[in-house]
Amino acid sequence: MSARVVRDMPEAEYHAHPALSQSRAKRLLPPSCPAKFHAPDPERTDAMEFGKLVHKLALEPGAESGYVPIDGNWSHKEPRDAVAAVRAAGLEPIKPEVMARAKRMAEKLRTHPVAAALLDDGNPEVSLFWTDEATGVECRARLDWLRNPVEGRRLLIPDLKSARSGSPTEFGKAAK
């Protein structure tokens, strides 16, 4: 089996690709059913959106430019109109305090000695495509970070997850 490695593939293009992803494959396993496999993806939560923001800020230089901070109560007319205008321009509105919290988390990650070493030399958001030999099914995966290989050393592939707590016990519960 040989995988095709694609760097710099836009996120929307990756998600539109028809190959089977891990998250869709899980929907085929018991106790799931075909209807769940064919159902639309679940609605994204605020926590998922925050994790995506931290992910982008930590791994993708310049990602902040895709976000526009908007103050105020977004249900009121002026901020609501500003949010709509930002989205119409293809950008993401963000509350300033949410952006500040995400930036702090991304900075902590980048200055942590182990995390910084893992994210030192490589590429973010690397897409992999291959055909499963046993089934002939085309598959896909997206790695948060793919380190550049070093001769004679094991290749480590870090996966960034955000959680309320960094304690091993709490994170273990959240990550299952």
Positions of the model-derived regions?
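Metal-dependent nuclease catalytic cores that hydrolyze phosphodiester bonds in DNA/RNA
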Residues: M1-R142
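Mg2+/Mn2+-dependent nuclease catalytic core
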Residues: L119-K176
